[in-house]
Design a protein with these regions (language model features):
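A residue-level marker of the well-folded mature domains of exported/periplasmic proteins
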Residues: 1-304
């Protein structure tokens, strides 16, 4: 289980103590919509009264999510299912976060070059927007998330190259949420594209997998690496000048705010839901300039 979710769990536990309510945190052992559904059905059968969920396959889980929403207050966090009957989404603008990651890579590669995108899966709402944000920065497109919400078919295709004047995105490789597959795909990519100049790892375990592949190939500091989330390997690589930076969410707040909102809803306070049905927990870019202070703060949240 990614550190990201352990930090989110710490936020849930803190909120459960503050609001004196019982909270269970369920983390499926694999990133599978089938396993997720089974785990959720099992816990619903125990008589829970509300749920915060990060849908693994938003488009294909709508009917099932709606069936849950008919039984109890249901909110989404981290990844959204905007077409479902969820009451609110707690998380960040993944498109803006993707753009922040793209900016890190662009700054590290002023001459441009070939870039590889690595991500767990593209069925999730968060991953689609995150990937597109990176692409649009490298392609010099001045857009916001609304462009894609209004034109859901405008996302770049997942196959083939995407080119601008100086950047070529050679491919988007997926690993279905498996770090060992992410490592293998990164190693293979370094052989397939020997002229590669940059890599963006868009799920928590992707930057460490890419880092290991670069280290094994003797290409650290030769190929720029930008990432997502706060894995210790990623933060150490930033500190050592071997990773240009990472875009971090605030999983502690995802957990804390999810419990707070569900508690308010169960108390009958529907005013807790904003008109936008979106509670924004803004992302941050972590680079060599601020990695030390951020890491100290992270250790405090994790109780280390």
């Amino acid at each position: 289980i990614a550190d990201f979710w352990k930090i989110a769990e710490a936020g849930c536990i803190a909120a459960s103590k503050e609001f004196e309510i019982e909270v269970q945190v369920i983390m499926p052992p694999e990133a599978s919509a089938v396993v997720q559904k089974q785990k959720v059905e099992d816990v619903i059968a125990t008589g829970i009264q509300g749920i915060a969920i990060s849908p693994l396959d938003a488009d294909n889980q709508i009917e099932w999510l709606n069936s849950i929403a008919e039984k109890m207050p249901m909110i989404t966090h981290d990844s959204d299912s905007p077409a479902s009957k969820r009451l609110v989404y707690i998380g960040m603008d993944n498109y803006a976060a993707g753009r922040a990651c793209g900016e890190i890579l662009k700054k590290a590669l002023p001459e441009g070059g070939q870039v590889l995108l690595c991500i767990g899966r593209l069925e999730q709402d968060n991953s689609k927007f995150r990937r597109q944000g990176v692409i649009d920065v490298l392609m010099e497109r001045d857009r916001t998330i609304d462009f894609y919400k209004e034109q859901p078919n405008a996302f770049d295709p997942t196959e083939g190259e995407i080119k601008s004047d100086i950047f070529t995105i050679v491919a988007t490789v997926t690993d279905q949420g498996k770090p060992e597959v992410a490592l293998q795909k990164a190693e293979d990519a370094l052989v397939t594209w020997p002229e590669l100049k940059g890599i963006a790892g868009l799920f928590e375990y992707n930057p460490p997998a890419c880092y290991q592949a670069l280290k094994k190939a003797g290409k650290l500091k030769q190929i720029a690496l930008a990432g997502f989330d706060e894995n210790d390997v990623t933060l150490q690589a930033i500190r050592d000048g071997e990773c240009a930076g990472t875009v971090v969410q605030n999983p502690y707040e995802y957990g804390f705010q999810s419990v707070r909102v569900l508690n308010e809803l169960l108390s009958g306070n529907k005013d807790i839901i904003p008109k936008s049905r979106y509670i924004d927990i803004a992302p941050r870019a972590i680079t060599a300039e601020n990695v030390e202070t951020y890491w100290e703060e992270l250790k405090r949240l994790k109780g280390q």
